[in-house]
């Protein structure tokens, strides 16, 4: 670069720093080492691997959408439990007014430490979310759900009144404000969304999500969660077989998917995933109905092995670590804003 260009650039940089503060513009040279991406585990080993970075990225917006009763809220509560386990502070903006503390506690959520808001309007919900993010004291915020973020004008109006595009404009404005603060405070914000059907679509999928297109653009990760079957023991239904597809991913290659079981009253079957993925990666050996680890038999049949892993959490954690290392996933989970940390997985 010529001397004249260098002087002009130096003057411009000095003016920018004078106007907007030091660090407003930086050169990505050797002194500015790229930091490891911090993540919060989803509570599902398979999904952590599918995301490519070991969990949901902090400082980003994540959208989780799917049909009714597909496990959207369960997945979010599992992630909240994982965040709290590492000392993180979490908030749950319950726009649907359907939060169940008993169920959340069963999933490992420390309900007494969870900040819960049940706002009256969409504007109030998003303003609360923005204030929490800007505080810098929250590690994870869940908004459940976008479809329930009803604009104030619609609530105060009469039934049948037309309010075309109000919710989409509300989301667009809120996300413009939120994005910068989310990055600066390194907060993970998860929006749960519902599916609607587009009328008159002849080709392609007729499904769409609520709240307009803004959330699709601002989200770094979009997860499509579906129930694919039921888990039965005789005639009794014990849970759901679930598939999650990574529709969009700005931090790793997209279009991967994970399959896991969600058991009623327990949540995601982490031990079941350890068995399936462990066998696939040759960490757990399967011979007929028998499973063995490090040359020792650990049970006959998947259900018995799952119980054994629950009773031996240190072995389960060891298998988990081996699977992550084999797949090149290092857990860059930092401690939250609280001082205490707990290295054990919450009991189910």
UniProtKB/Swiss-Prot annotation:
Q: Which Gene Ontology cellular-component terms appear in the entry?
A: cytosol
Q: Which Gene3D superfamilies match?
A: P-loop containing nucleotide triphosphate hydrolases
Between which residues do disulfide bridges form?
A: none
Q: Which Pfam families match?
A: RecA, RecA_C
Compartmental location = Cytoplasm
Keywords carried by this UniProt record: ATP-binding, Cytoplasm, DNA damage, DNA recombination, DNA repair, DNA-binding, Nucleotide-binding, SOS response
Say what the protein does.
Can catalyze the hydrolysis of ATP in the presence of single-stranded DNA, the ATP-dependent uptake of single-stranded DNA by duplex DNA, and the ATP-dependent hybridization of homologous single-stranded DNAs. It interacts with LexA causing its activation and leading to its autocatalytic cleavage.
Name of the molecule in the record: Protein RecA
Q: Which organism is it from?
A: Neisseria meningitidis serogroup C / serotype 2a (strain ATCC 700532 / DSM 15464 / FAM18)
Gene name on record?
recA
